[in-house]
Amino acid sequence: MINFTRKPRYGYEDLLEIIRLLRSPEGCPWDRVQTHQSIRRGMLEEAYEAAEAIDTDNAALLKEELGDVLMQVVFHAGIEADAGRFDMDDVCDGVVKKLLYRHPHVFGDGQAETADTVPASWEQLKRQEKGQKTTADALDAVARSLPGLWRAEKIQKKAAEAGFDWRDVSAALDKLDEETAELRQAVRDGTNVEEELGDVLFATVKVGRFCGVDPETAVNGTCEKFIRRFRAMEEAAAAEGRSLSDMTLEEMTALWNGAKECS
């Protein structure tokens, strides 16, 4: 048994210590054997749960989920500390130096008249810092682990900053029509369907960007709408003493259309 001082309230240093103890030879056998890869999914899940707490404006839940995200950060740093490569102090040192460098208008003699001017300056300094000499370098640096729609939006935005973009939303919609026609042809031919579907999704993201709509938010909203309507359809079937599995597609479509009218 490990003795850990119990307190009415714990702080950052306590979190570092408990993670260290959990990974120690006397600690938890599960925690000791974890690797970056084995807990990678957990880190993503905690980040998404924190995002959901933000979306629902739930302060109590956000406090909990931010703690879970921080635990993941400390755990990953603990793995590296055990390997002798870096620790949490190195992580904090790096991010503080980054913030100092990318805020010359606060910690130096740079100028930023409005909040709108800051992102462009941040991006320019980021590219200098990472040695991205061309726009292609910046595009290639967009994380491949991002959700596809999110990655597409970031890539398009960086390309647009270099002047490569459609004139307006009408031109973007025309491109979407073109890509949709190519997808239809690919489906008929039975070839290149994945590539053409990707082109349609990429073009759809472009339309959303012109309209100021976040594609991930949009598709998640549609998912929620689908769930609501499906639930209404299922409840309508149950009210008739029936199950969806016993109904024809035409019968389910009629219930679906009724659910659409009510939502």
What is each of the regions a protein language model found here?
Residues 1-65, 71-197, 201-263:
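Flexible "arm" and connector segments at domain edges
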